């Protein structure tokens, strides 16, 4: 079994705390459904530290949000945050991609966009199905929540998560434009 490094454990702790606390704020768009800028944390930390970190940050962070908010832990949505974080982390496994070193290409950005969008859709559908099957929530309510949450998460991912991740990679890029004068 692979061991988690100290650096990865610390990153997971920081990411989960940020995601958990920032998850308390959002803009309501449907019943119990919000645009939450905290989703960008899953994109950035997933891209920096990989799918396992993204998964754990999503699971732990969402549990923190639900616990602090006091509305009870909604496990379907907790798991969906883990799925989203996991999907965002796939980019970190691509050869040649590194936010830390500023190495990426257009194919990497497309890959992150596609895996992120697929992860969001799968995760939100899972959460909705879980709420209907396990929690006994009404189908009509869940359809509205699933549509609202999917739209909200896609907006946050495309407007905040993706640009912040690209910006971090650009800021870490090693510039080779300098020439040594003789």
From Swiss-Prot:
Presence of keyword Transmembrane: yes
Keyword Cytoplasm: no
Subcellular location: Cell membrane
Gene3D superfamilies from the UniProt entry: 1.10.1760.20
Transmembrane segments: 9-29, 40-60, 71-91, 114-134, 142-162
Highest taxon of source: Bacteria
Keyword terms, alphabetized: Cell membrane, Membrane, Transmembrane, Transmembrane helix
InterPro entries found in the cross-reference section: ECF_substrate-spec-like, UPF0397
Membrane topology: Multi-pass membrane protein
Family per record: Belongs to the UPF0397 family.
Name this polypeptide is given: UPF0397 protein BCQ_2505
Species: Bacillus cereus (strain Q1)
Taxonomy of the source species: Bacteria, Bacillati, Bacillota, Bacilli, Bacillales
């Amino acid at each position: 079994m692979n061991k988690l490094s100290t650096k990865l454990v610390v990153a997971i702790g920081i990411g989960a705390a940020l995601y958990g606390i920032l998850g308390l704020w959002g803009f309501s768009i449907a019943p119990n459904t919000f645009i939450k800028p905290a989703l960008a944390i899953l994109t950035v930390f997933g891209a920096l530290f990989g799918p396992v970190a993204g998964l754990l940050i999503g699971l732990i962070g969402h549990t923190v949000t639900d616990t602090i908010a006091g509305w009870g832990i909604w496990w379907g949505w907790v798991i969906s945050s883990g799925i989203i974080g996991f999907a965002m982390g796939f980019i970190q496994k691509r050869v040649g991609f590194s936010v830390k070193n500023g190495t990426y290409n257009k194919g990497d950005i497309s890959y992150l966009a596609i895996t992120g969008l697929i992860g969001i859709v799968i995760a939100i559908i899972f959460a909705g199905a879980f709420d209907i099957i396990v929690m006994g929530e009404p189908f009509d309510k869940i359809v509205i929540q699933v549509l609202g949450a999917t739209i909200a998460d896609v907006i946050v991912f495309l407007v905040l998560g993706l640009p912040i991740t690209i910006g971090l990679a650009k800021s870490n890029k090693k510039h080779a434009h300098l020439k040594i004068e003789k």
